[in-house]
From Swiss-Prot:
The keyword Chaperone applies. Component of the ClpX-ClpP complex. Forms a hexameric ring that, in the presence of ATP, binds to fourteen ClpP subunits assembled into a disk-like structure with a central cavity, resembling the structure of eukaryotic proteasomes. The gene is clpX. The keyword Aminoacyl-tRNA synthetase does not apply. PROSITE patterns: CLPX_ZB (PS51902). SUPFAM superfamilies: Glucocorticoid receptor-like (DNA-binding domain) (SSF57716), P-loop containing nucleoside triphosphate hydrolases (SSF52540). This is ATP-dependent Clp protease ATP-binding subunit ClpX. It comes from the Bacteria. NCBIfam families: clpX, PRK05342.1. Belongs to the ClpX chaperone family. ATP-dependent specificity component of the Clp protease. It directs the protease to specific substrates. Can perform chaperone functions in the absence of ClpP. One of its GO terms (cellular component) is HslUV protease complex. SMART domains: AAA, ClpB_D2-small, zf-C4_ClpX.
């Protein structure tokens, strides 16, 4: 006699008599206990998805101005006033972007930044360090290479193309980015009065940059192609991009001195006589800059209005240049010491050598920018021979290496 086959749950294997209900399907059965278990699992899955969505929507914490300033201190020596101005402006810019996601009756204005300071004072480094800290795309352009659309040269919209390239053409990321335009003082118009003739590399470029800096929806060809009528364009909202413009503005100090009467010039008994020590520093003068001064220099009023935050940088003295060589996280001397350590060789710079290098950079009037070429020249022959020299333990750069072009001192393993 064959035993009648008992019905059982296809999932847990329990027989019909062990459960309250057994529901039949086309090719199997499921019990009430398994149904309840599946229900709980689905409910938990919904909760997990909601948590995931909330987690994804939560933005990373925006660093405070104090935190931004502290990070800049790690990489840039001096320029305390400029760092403070930048920290506040950058914090307010990204706070503004986040506030746009919430409905607000008050529209917050865009605060682009103008950096004014001598060559090699750290303008580019400040902008690069900010972008790296905030983990946002960064693009840099030289204003002297830009021209209006239709002229030979680099179209101003190419700057946006570079920004998109640096974030793999992710438009949302690009719109959180920073664009630094260097040598902005080189595109000033030749006189205060508007010219009848076209000024291709001056006022015309300012006009072309105006819309981008102010905020517009620019059409950019994908993957760096050329524009043509049938092409589908990428649309980038530049009102969300932070623009930082920088320049040396040589001669602007004279314009400010003339307006504020701080130059100490004059003849006769009523003249304002000053000794050199009392002369107002370049940084203090630039802190007093007004839109009218920039107009006299050659920037158009509309362009000045789009750069409301002005951060002046000071000239670097000998002490600052020595610190730049040794103190920042990526200081030049540290970089070359790492290079030499890859060959298991120690590299040392004497204090006198560091001072001599700083003096040489000051004499060349290249600021911090000229330090790398000085160090590279000093170590060129040594680096050329380095892989071929056996038992070399240490290389010492002394003052004579800098001032008299003597070879660095080599020490060998005994």
């Amino acid at each position: 006699m064959t035993k009648e086959k008992e019905l059982h749950c296809s999932f847990c294997g329990k027989e019909q008599k062990e459960v309250d209900k057994l529901i039949a399907g086309t090719s199997g059965y499921i019990c009430n206990e398994c149904i309840e278990l599946c229900h709980d699992m689905l409910a938990n899955a919904d909760d997990i998805e909601e948590i995931d969505e909330e987690f994804q929507e939560e933005e990373p914490k925006l660093p405070t101005p104090h935190e931004i300033r502290a990070h800049l201190d790690d990489y840039v020596i001096g320029q305390d006033y400029a760092k403070k101005v930048l920290a506040v402006a950058v914090y307010n810019h990204y706070k503004r972007l986040r506030s746009e996601k919430n409905t607000s009756e008050v529209e917050l204005g865009k605060s682009n930044i103008l950096l004014i300071g001598p060559t090699g004072s750290g303008k580019t480094l400040l902008a690069q360090t900010l972008a790296r800290m905030l983990n946002v795309p960064f693009a840099m352009a030289d204003a002297t290479t830009l021209t209006e659309a239709g002229y030979v040269g680099e179209d101003v919209e190419n700057v946006l193309q570079k920004l998109l390239q640096n974030c793999d053409y992710d438009i949302e990321k690009a719109q959180q980015g920073i664009i630094y335009i260097d040598e902005i003082d080189k595109i000033t118009r030749k006189s205060e009065n508007p010219s009848i003739t076209r000024d291709v590399s001056g006022e015309g470029v300012q006009q072309a940059l105006l819309k981008l800096v102010e905020g517009t929806v620019a059409s950019i060809p994908p993957q760096g192609g050329r524009k043509h009528p049938q092409q589908e364009m990428l649309r980038v909202d530049t009102s969300k991009i932070l623009f930082i413009c920088g320049g040396a503005f040589a001669g602007l100090d004279k314009i400010i001195e003339k307006r504020t009467n701080t130059g100490g010039k004059g003849i006769g008994f009523g003249a304002d006589v000053r000794i050199d020590e009392e002369k107002v520093s370049l940084t203090e003068l630039f802190k007093q800059v007004e839109p009218d001064d920039l107009m006299k220099f050659g920037l158009i009023p509309e362009f000045i209005g789009r750069l409301p935050v002005i951060a002046p940088l000071s000239e670097l003295d000998e002490e600052a240049l020595v610190k730049i060589l040794t103190e920042p996280k990526n200081a030049l001397t540290k970089q070359y010491q790492v290079l030499f350590s890859l060959e298991n060789i120690e590299l040392e710079f004497t204090q006198e050598a560091l001072i001599a290098m700083a003096k040489k950079a000051l004499a060349r009037k290249t600021g911090a920018r000229g330090l790398r070429s000085i160090v590279e020249t000093l170590l060129l022959d040594t680096m050329y021979d380095l892989p071929s020299i056996e038992n070399l333990q240490k290389v010492i750069v002394e003052e004579e290496t800098v001032t008299e072009n003597k070879a660095p001192v080599l020490k060998f393993n005994s």
